[in-house]
């Protein structure tokens, strides 16, 4: 179980280099935050941020 959690909205930090702001996320992965880009209603399963943001390819 990953020790990271984040609110439905807000800022999510996982590890030293990952920071996702205003992500619609409910859990963090150790590598980064599981989140959707703005305007994305649903993320693909297993989508993770690369750097500080997710690409539109995460959207379903």
From Swiss-Prot:
Protein's recorded name: Metallothionein-2
Annotated residues for binding of a divalent metal cation 1: 4, 6, 20, 23
Organismal lineage: Eukaryota, Metazoa, Chordata, Craniata, Vertebrata
UniProt keyword terms in alphabetical order: Metal-binding, Metal-thiolate cluster
Induction note: By zinc ions.
Residues that, per the record, bind a divalent metal cation 4: 32-33, 43, 47
Pfam families: Metallothio (PF00131)
Key word Metal-binding present: yes
Family: Belongs to the metallothionein superfamily. Type 1 family.
Region (Alpha) location: 29-60
Entry binding sites for a divalent metal cation 6: 36, 40, 43, 59
Organism: Danio rerio (Zebrafish)
Residue sites binding a divalent metal cation 2 per the record: 6, 12, 14, 25
């Amino acid at each position: 179980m990953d020790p990271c959690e984040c609110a439905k909205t807000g800022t999510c930090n996982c590890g030293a280099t990952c920071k996702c702001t205003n992500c619609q996320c409910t859990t963090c992965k150790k590598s980064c935050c599981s989140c959707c880009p703005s305007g994305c209603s649903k993320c693909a399963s297993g989508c993770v941020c690369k750097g500080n943001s997710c690409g539109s390819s995460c959207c379903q």
